[in-house]
Amino acid sequence: AASDVYKRQGVDHDHLAIPSLLAVAALETYLVRTRKNTAISLIIETAEPCEVHHFATLLGFGASAVNPYLALDSLYDMINRGLVDKDYSQASKAYIDALVSGIVKIASKMGISTIQSYQGSKIFEALGISESVMNEYFPDTVSRVGGIDLDDIAKRSMTMHESAFDPNDLGMDEGLRSVGWHKERSNQEEHLYNPETIHLLQQATWRDDYNLFKQYTSCVNAEDRHITLRSTLDFKFAEDGGIPMEEVESVESIMRRFKTGAMSYGSISQEAHECMAIAMNRIGGKSNSGEGGEDLERIVTAGSAVDKCSAIKQVASGRFGVTSKYLTSAKEIQIKMAQGAKPGEGGHLPAKKVYPWIAKTRHSTPGVALISPPPHHDIYSIEDLAQLIYDLKNANKKARISVKLVSEAGVGTIAAGVAKAGAGVILISGYDGGTGAAPGSSIHNAGLPWELGLAETHQTLIQNNLRSKVVIEADGKMMSGRDVVIAAMLGAEEYGFATAPLVTMGCVMMRVCNLDTCPVGVATQNPELRKRFHGKPEYVINFMRFMAQEMREYMAKLGIHTVDELVGRSDLLVQKQYPAGTHESKIDMSRILTNPYAKEDSHVKMHFVPEDVYDFKLDKTIDETVIIPEMKEALAKKQKKEISINVRNLNRSL
């Protein structure tokens, strides 16, 4: 087979570089269309790639080999300046090994076992790129909201070129700047959680000051901040001014729809974990145990004045801490199929955080890292999932069974299967969800906004006459009442918050969750650092109350009385208008705002209806009809008894 080497050499004051991914994808697309792709290998020599995701996309769109000469030259320069204490061969090998490890990790998340199978697989979804660019250069890759076109890409390349070759021949600043992609830097990459918003949220909840909270949400929802898809949407407020606040559903009723995210005991401290549970139990909401189990000492407090028992008990692939008592203490049992911030990966608790008391709760060994496998090894089909749902329902008849999915293209079809399998709740988790132990490439490049997955799920369930059978929940960095109202209008009935409650308890976004060095005692097991925890349940309660109150203000302006009335009302949302030619003006939210049926179609059920819930027929199980009646007297007297029964394959659980 022949080889074609694409080089970025020759770039100078008068010659602009073509983005390497665009060039590779264009060449590969041409070769596929002319049926020559199997006769030639594409080798790219480029200065652009330096991170795992860069190489993963180049390989995924057709490159056979990549020579990242600038990254390797930079290593050589760093060694010469004494910044790296290795010789060049060691340093370059370590760098390449890290890249290979990252690419293998990405391939494994997609269920691909060889790099040859990964090459040219195009297993990506684009966010913010126009269909014209995708159809021409990245065919078969999904891009649902449109975005920048070829002219915009050219302008960006020109801007980067001019930063290296000054068109006015003036002196250039050759220093390298930190763009603040992962950590906040002044006047660089924008972050929703920044020093200002963190300070305002903490002060508002600590002082119980709603006016300060409104200042916080004003910063989050600022018109000039276009960080999320929902920031491009606006409301169609009622022309008559709406309804009086007194006619809107109460704060207390709305708060019962709120949940805290699945953060395990181990990933966060005992104090932080219990603080959230106490807060949510007081307001009638639900806290989530995460996948790390829960101590019996907390479970027995259920129903008491200081109730530390998490209402939601999570079952993940590792089954850490899952016992009969754990399951029977739940009001909701959640099966974690994936995690919003790192879909395709399992949970990971670093070894340094597995203290003896954590190992005890998780039934594991201290000092040994705990990794949940990416898949559940007993779930390879919807039928397998249906069996696990049925088993868990038999373990706790009173608990709702929830299934956690992530926002991705096609999640609607999966959600339809989950609804048919008997789940009571479907959670759509967005990519903004935080996680302390995820690789950087996953945090920044895996998952999708919850707006996409939520809208698709709601629309698909309606079209398949399944919407009334399940509750839809959404989470992923919901920071204001506006965010929650939009989530409701796109189809969600319940709402999860994780980062915000942590911030109210003192989190200052040091981003060292995985290192066990959290300076405020939130995400550490170190006994000395835990003493610095000063969070209170009241702070979390204040946040939830403020969110519900702000929701009520929007609902009043919309003329909506209850959250149930609000669910699915995407017809009350409209895309904002931006000046022609701007990046924002090229975003197309029509697919998200599509309503499968008009509001006037009264026969269509747009939200959960309790009467339509899945019937497991638990009263007809072999347990209820044979085993329990036979054992009733022995159980009452706490005696042993042997019985003989016929078990058939129709008896799914016993």
Model-derived regions, located:
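Conserved, well-structured core domains of diverse proteins
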Residues: 90, 94-97, 101, 105-108, ...
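Gly-rich Lys/Arg/Thr-decorated short loops/hinges at beta-loop-alpha junctions or inter-strand turns
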Residues: 7-15, 37, 254-260, 343, ...
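Glycine/Thr-rich beta-alpha phosphate-binding loop at enzyme active sites
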Residues: 12-24, 28, 366-380, 414-463, ...
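Glycine-rich beta-to-alpha transition loops that act as phosphate-gripper elements at the mouths
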Residues: 40-52, 291, 404-410, 468-482
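Flexible glycine/proline-rich, aromatic-decorated loop/lid segments
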Residues: 24-30, 37, 52-86, 93, ...
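Catalytic cores of alpha/beta
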Residues: 49-61, 410-421, 479-492
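Conserved, mostly hydrophobic/aromatic
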Residues: 8, 58, 114, 280, ...
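Short, small-residue-biased leader/transition segments that mark boundaries at the very start
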Residues: 2-6
